[in-house]
């Protein structure tokens, strides 16, 4: 197994930000910082088709990647898309003051799950607008809420199954900080939080991974919603890296208690070690490190 930095822009304790992009077809990649002034920084190849740069880029800095001197693209592993799926990506700081240190999760036998859509559950359609309703859900006997997919999609309202930025909670819902506040509040009310994730296809608009890393997709399989994700062909190790690190980030950075995997019948993998098995193994390793249960279900 290879060891790579986390994908995307990672703001670090020393005030620098590490940028890592999987762009296996590119011969040259530059990081283009748009704030506070336009700056172009060459990225270095680090193997496996990945490119890396470390520079000063505080939270809020907007950026793109420039491939082979001409094509400027957002970050497929962006944590924030403040101007939508076609706009620049933005650096975020994952630091958050949590209050759920004593949280031990909910036992499997005690789960009573309420599925909700963030955009339609309240008139405001945001993560934080859900918080006042948590006591009501708890008093109904609910022990966990399941959020329909929140990964950034085109526009402001969507069922969530057209997501194209797997690492970015949708901006109109409240983004990174809004989701963390919701999870923290849910745990304070004794409610677990599950997240619906889509690892079988990407949405049709704003999927720049197709252009930046063509091996992420395969024509050997078909889904009804878009190109199948390459989990077992050439360079599929990098695809697994992108997807599995995404799952682990929801658990680690957002304190999500488990993931509901959408349409697992469309996650095609004929390799000896199926990606779902690998995902389950890595999630359980993460649960042991976190000291609380983490569930996967479909």
Regions found by a protein language model. Give the residues of each.
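Substrate-binding/active-site clefts of carbohydrate-active enzymes
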Residues: 104-108, 117-255, 263-290, 295
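Short acidic, flexible loop segments centered on an aromatic residue
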Residues: 33-35
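The feature marks proteins involved in alpha-glucan
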Residues: 1-18, 37-115, 120-125, 136
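A glycine-rich phosphate-binding loop feature that marks nucleotide/adenosyl-phosphate handling sites
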Residues: 298
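Short beta-strand elements bearing conserved aromatic residues within extracellular beta-rich modules
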Residues: 29-31, 63
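Short proline/glycine-enriched turn/loop motifs at strand-loop junctions of beta-rich domains
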Residues: 22-29, 58
């Amino acid at each position: 197994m290879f060891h790579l930095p986390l994908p995307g822009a990672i703001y670090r304790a020393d005030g620098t930000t590490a940028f890592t992009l999987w762009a296996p077809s590119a011969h040259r990649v530059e990081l283009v910082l748009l704030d506070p002034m336009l700056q172009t920084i060459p990225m270095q190849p680090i193997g496996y088709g990945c490119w890396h740069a470390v520079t000063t880029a505080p939270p809020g800095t907007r950026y793109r990647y420039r491939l082979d001197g001409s094509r400027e693209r957002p970050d497929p592993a962006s944590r924030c898309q403040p101007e939508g799926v076609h706009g620049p990506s933005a650096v975020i700081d994952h630091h958050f003051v949590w209050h759920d240190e004593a949280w031990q999760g909910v036992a499997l036998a005690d789960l009573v799950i309420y599925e909700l859509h963030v955009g339609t559950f309240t008139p405001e359609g945001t993560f934080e607008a859900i918080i006042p309703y948590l006591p009501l859900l708890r008093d109904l006997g609910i022990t966990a809420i399941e959020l329909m997919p929140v990964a950034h999609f085109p526009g402001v309202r969507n069922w969530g199954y057209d997501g194209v930025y797997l690492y970015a909670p949708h901006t109109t819902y409240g983004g990174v900080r809004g989701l963390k506040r919701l999870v923290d509040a849910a745990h304070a009310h004794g409610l677990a939080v599950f997240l619906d994730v889509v690892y079988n296809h990407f949405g049709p608009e704003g999927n720049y991974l197709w252009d930046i890393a063509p091996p992420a997709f395969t024509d050997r399989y078909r889904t009804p919603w878009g190109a199948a994700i390459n989990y077992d062909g050439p360079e599929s190790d990098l695809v697994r890296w992108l997807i599995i690190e995404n799952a682990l980030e929801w658990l680690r950075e957002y304190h999500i208690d488990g993931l509901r995997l959408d349409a697992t019948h469309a996650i095609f993998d004929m390799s000896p070690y199926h990606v779902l098995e690998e995902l389950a193994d890595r999630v359980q390793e993460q649960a042991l490190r976190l000291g609380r249960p983490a569930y996967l279900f479909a």
